[in-house]
From Swiss-Prot:
It comes from Shewanella loihica (strain ATCC BAA-1088 / PV-4). PANTHER family: RIBOSOMAL RNA METHYLTRANSFERASE (PTHR10920), RRNA METHYLTRANSFERASE 2, MITOCHONDRIAL (PTHR10920:SF18). The keyword Methyltransferase applies. Specifically methylates the uridine in position 2552 of 23S rRNA at the 2'-O position of the ribose in the fully assembled 50S ribosomal subunit. This is Ribosomal RNA large subunit methyltransferase E. It is found in: Cytoplasm. S-adenosyl-L-methionine binds at residues 63, 65, 83, 99, 124. It catalyses: uridine(2552) in 23S rRNA + S-adenosyl-L-methionine = 2'-O-methyluridine(2552) in 23S rRNA + S-adenosyl-L-homocysteine + H(+). The active site is at 164 (proton acceptor). It is an enzyme of class 2 (transferase). Its main location: cytoplasm. Belongs to the class I-like SAM-binding methyltransferase superfamily. RNA methyltransferase RlmE family. The keyword Transferase applies.
Length: 209
């Protein structure tokens, strides 16, 4: 029965994907994923990235967010991206492939950042979903906690943070931790985020720790 459910669910996802307005629009605009529209919508509302800024993009593959970030940061800016999956090169993006949960990968990422502080940390990271909430939610919360730790290590005063979080156990505590670190925290559900998804984006500005 579970195999049939998974098959039905997969079929539904594929149908949704190919019928999806944002998938078609991303292909038309030469964007690597529909996720690009999420950061684009956030940028329109919150103006996180400006020319000359340094941006770290966690969970970057296939590159939708990095495409938008490098365009906004411009030639004087810098985008450093990381993902466990490979990513085709993007002009102006310094990409590191590796598991962000591993200390050696974190250290390699910090090396690429160097002594300069980062203006914006972006995280669209998500674990491989098993479909079991009791397994998936803790994994997802662990990743967003690592992203917040990254902010504490590299973010400049008054810097910004945009992170995908799945609503569920641990969400309220995480929101509290983000509020302690930033002056303003807003919850965004972009139009391009699928309605039935539990994902929301926390957009935090004014880093103060």
């Amino acid at each position: 029965m579970s195999g049939k459910k998974r098959t039905a669910s997969s079929t539904r996802w594929m149908q949704e994907h190919f019928d999806d307005h944002y998938v078609k629009l991303s292909q038309k605009r030469g964007l690597r994923s529909r996720a690009a529209f999420k950061i684009e919508e956030i940028q329109q509302k919150d103006k996180l990235i400006r020319p000359g800024m340094t941006v770290v993009d966690l969970g970057a593959a296939p590159g939708g967010w990095s495409q938008i970030a490098v365009k906004l940061a411009g030639e004087t800016g810098k985008v450093i991206a990381c993902d466990i999956l490979p990513m085709d090169p993007i002009v102006g993006v310094d990409f590191l492939q590796g598991d962000f949960r591993e200390e050696k990968v974190l250290n390699a990422l910090l090396e690429r950042v160097g002594d300069a502080k980062v203006d914006v940390v972006l995280s669209d990271m998500a674990p491989n979903m098993s479909g079991t909430g009791g397994v998936d939610q803790p994994r997802a919360m662990y990743l967003v906690e690592l992203a917040l730790d990254m902010c504490h290590q590299v973010l400049a005063p008054n810097g910004s943070f945009a992170v995908k979080v799945f609503q569920g156990e641990g969400f309220d505590e995480y929101m509290k931790a983000v509020r302690e670190a930033f002056t303003t925290v807003k919850t965004r559900k972009p139009d391009s985020s699928r309605p039935r998804s539990r994902e929301v984006y926390l957009v935090a500005t004014g880093y103060k720790l």
